[in-house]
Amino acid sequence: MKTKGLKVLTAAAVLSLGLMTMEALAAEGWAMSGNTWVYMDQYGNRVTNEWRKGADNLWRYLNGNGEMAVSCWADEDYFVDSNGIMVANKWVKTRSYYGGDEDVWFYFGNSGKVVKDGWKKIDGRNYLFDSEGVMQTGWTEDNLYYLGSDGAMKTGWRYLEPPYDEDEDDYTYGPESDDGQYWYYFAPSGKKYCTSTGDEEGEYRVSRIDGKYYCFDSTGKMQTGWVYMDG
C-alpha cells in the first residue's frame, strides 16, 4: 500500500510540474508592468538588452531594466520612437548616442541602422554623414563639395562664403567682395570647379558652362575683370 501511495504521489507531482511548465511557457510574451511594457521569457524572467517583435510584427527594444525603450537610442546604432518601434527609412533629429549639447540630424536606413561614414543618396539627393552618423552641412571633402543647411549636396551656381582655412586661421578671401560671398560652380557630381579639378595647370581654370566661358581661381571663386594668366 505504501508503494502504491508513493506512485500516486509521484504521478501527481509530475502532473503538477507539467502544468507549471505549461503555464510558464504560455506566459512568454509582452506584459504591462506599471506604466511600461516588458517582455517575459518562458521562465517568467524579463528579457533585457534584446529586440522583440510586437503583435504588429515591428521591432521593439528591451533596455537593461527589461523595460521597452521609447524615444531614444537603442543598441547603440538604432533609434526607437515614442511607441517603442524601431525607426527605419526615416530622419530623426536628436542628440548623438555619444553625447552632445544640441540636437542634430541622423538617418536610419532600411534595416533601422543609422547611416555612418560616407555619402548616402536619399530620395534622390546626396548627403554626407560622419563617423557618429551626424548629417554634415557646409563645405566638406577638402572644400570641394558644398552641403546646404538641409544637408543636401549642391550643384550648379552657388553664391557662398568661402570655406574656412584652418591653416591660416582666417577666411580665404580672394577678390574683394562687399558681403564676403562669391560665386562658385559645382558640377553634377557635386565637385567644385577650381584649378585642382580641371585639366589646366596653373593658378586659374577656364571652363565653358552653358555656352559661356568662366574663370575660376584655385579656391573655386569665379573671377571678374582682368585676370593675368601664364601662357
Regions found by a protein language model. Give the residues of each.
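Extracellular adhesion/carbohydrate-binding repeat motifs centered on closely spaced tryptophans
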Residues: 2-231
